[in-house]
Amino acid sequence: MAAKEYYGVALLKNTRGAMAVEDGAKKKGMAVRIIPTPSTIYASCGFSLKYELTEEETLKELLQELGLSVDGFYHAEKTGLSVSYEKV
């Protein structure tokens, strides 16, 4: 049986915002990376931020510090090649 992986996806409003959040998060030592927005969620700007669920509150605080907002937060569950998303 395939192991399950859980992570968060934050949908950013624009590419510049995605890059600013990624840069700020990495400076804080967070494990984040820009990914293409999964088509099953929403198109948005085309880029999202993948993050560890344990860092969700820290990410929200960083967004507030930077004066940026998101189109939504999702929790992902990946089993093998299958990924499901739940909006939070």
Descriptions of predicted regions:
Residues 1, 24-32, 84-88:
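A short, terminal or domain-edge coil/loop segment
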Residues 1-4, 41:
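Solvent-exposed alpha-helices and their adjacent loops that cap or buttress functional pockets
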Residues 4-11:
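Short glycine-/aliphatic-rich beta-strand segments at the starts of folded cytosolic domains
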Residues 6, 43-45, 69-70:
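A generic structural signal for well-ordered coil/turn residues at beta-strand boundaries
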Residues 11-14, 77-79:
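Short, flexible beta-strand-to-coil junctions
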Residues 13-19, 84-88:
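Short N-terminal helix-initiation segments at or just after the protein's N-terminus
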Residues 13-15, 22-64:
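Amphipathic, hydrophobic secondary-structure cores in small proteins
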Residues 56-88:
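C-terminal structural segments of small proteins and small subunits
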